Amino acid sequence: MATLKDIAIEAGVSLATVSRVLNDDPTLNVKEETKHRILEIAEKLEYKTSSARKLQTGAVNQHHILAIYSYQQELEINDPYYLAIRHGIETQCEKLGIELTNCYEHSGLPDIKNVTGILIVGKPTPALRAAASALTDNICFIDFHEPGSGYDAVDIDLARISKEIIDFYINQGVNRIGFIGGEDEPGKADIREVAFAEYGRLKQVVREEDIWRGGFSSSSGYELAKQMLAREDYPKALFVASDSIAIGVLRAIHERGLNIPQDISLISVNDIPTARFTFPPLSTVRIHSEMMGSQGVNLVYEKARDGRALPLLVFVPSKLKLRGTTR
């Protein structure tokens, strides 16, 4: 069975582009030649959407999952990390024969009364929690967890990753490390920054003035890095919270005329496809974000099937991939 990923690889485009072309997204700005190539490949591989497969087979799904994304849909275009999570959800639902409804919180929830379970991707608002719990108690958070919530969760051990990056730099003889990151809530540090600051101070390699926080975008990374580099004294080793931010940081460093990694080095998180093609290629922590989506589906499905009462927290594996932005 062909998948969106198969089409994206053969067409040489991103998953986001394939998804938007096949869904006839009117806001997509792409060459007609590219659209035709994607459609031809989809036809050649006999790709069918999940709804088309259901019509063709006449199958009736016993399970129905509602996936709610607590962010703007545009974020999937700017950060492939989130698109990969959604792709993992969609692929696993197709594999298990589960009916799936996707929706974005800001667009409102669909009028669905009977669901097997709900996946919430990203940190939920209190209103979203209340709406979801009114539909079912089989809820799984993805890319977020909260001890004591009573719900399943699939997440990344970001605190461990932050410590791993600090230890890597310390083993290289670095005695001052900076941080450039984003925030999920205005004025509030995310777990990467919190763990970085706490562990870095313990190891005496972090200063308060070397912590920079903005948004999770390349433009934010660019602006923050420019501000940092404008100072006479700045850290020569950086932990950047995501690859998307790091792309902007790289641009600011290049514009400053600095050599990477001789003058300044950096490590980011996610290992998006673009990370291998930056200049120099990004050293980054690979996150199996597609697995986060598929494992979320598995937890909801397994709880519905077996009646498990205790909530589970699953951390997906990660691996530091050293490339050209570190010594």
Swiss-Prot record:
Keywords: DNA-binding, Repressor, Transcription, Transcription regulation. InterPro entries: HTH_LacI, LacI/GalR-like_sensor, Lambda_DNA-bd_dom_sf, Peripla_BP_I. PROSITE patterns: HTH_LACI_1, HTH_LACI_2. Residues 4-23 bind DNA. One of its GO terms (molecular function) is transcription cis-regulatory region binding. SMART domains: HTH_LACI. Signal peptide: none annotated. One of its GO terms (biological process) is regulation of DNA-templated transcription. Repressor for beta galactosidase alpha and beta subunits (ebgA and ebgC). Binds lactose as an inducer. The gene is ebgR. This is HTH-type transcriptional regulator EbgR. Residues 1-57 form the HTH lacI-type domain. The keyword Repressor applies.
